[in-house]
Structures are given as C-alpha cells and as structure tokens.
C-alpha cells in the first residue's frame, strides 16, 4: 500500500481526498499483470478532509473519517485528479462505504 502523502489541497464541504492503494502487480497464481489489465483499487488512505456539510442550522456536520484512515469506496464514486504526480480521488463522504480498522 502506498504511504499517504501530505498534500496542499483543501476539499470543500463533505468531500474527502483519498490516495488509492496500489493496484495488484501479479495474480495469486504469479502472473504479472500489465497496466491495462489492472483493476482500479477501491481502497485508499484519506489525505485531506473538508470542514463538513453545511446544515440548515448554519453549523457544519462532522465527518466520520479523518486524515490517515483507510477506507473502501464505491467503484464509480468521486473524481480522479493528479496532485504532484500522484493519483488521488475526491469523494463525497457518502461515496465511502467503510472504514478499515
């Protein structure tokens, strides 16, 4: 798994920036996979979180994830971006399915 990198990016509202885990290089049988055959990971480390969704009361809703958490997210959720040569995903908190650990 890639080590989470500190980034200069502040997501808005209930958005979270996740650094995806590295895709598997080989299969369980030892076959080396080319980049075109690797499945995109659905797991990663949270590297930045927004301040929370603005509620009707004017307060901000607290996010249930924080920087350093390892999360599982939906396959088609979020937007892919590149920051300092690293692939990242910007997800809404609702795109995150589970927190590991």
Curated annotation (Swiss-Prot):
Keywords: Chaperone, Cytoplasm. The keyword Cytoplasm applies. The keyword Endoplasmic reticulum does not apply. It comes from the Bacteria. GO terms for biological process: chaperone cofactor-dependent protein refolding. Its main location: cytoplasm. GO terms for cellular component: cytoplasm. It is found in: Cytoplasm. GO terms for molecular function: ATP binding; metal ion binding; protein folding chaperone; protein-folding chaperone binding; unfolded protein binding. Heptamer of 7 subunits arranged in a ring. Interacts with the chaperonin GroEL. PANTHER family: 10 KDA HEAT SHOCK PROTEIN, CO-CHAPERONIN GROES. Together with the chaperonin GroEL, plays an essential role in assisting protein folding. The GroEL-GroES system forms a nano-cage that allows encapsulation of the non-native substrate proteins and provides a physical environment optimized to promote and accelerate protein folding. GroES binds to the apical surface of the GroEL ring, thereby capping the opening of the GroEL channel. Belongs to the GroES chaperonin family. This is Co-chaperonin GroES 1.
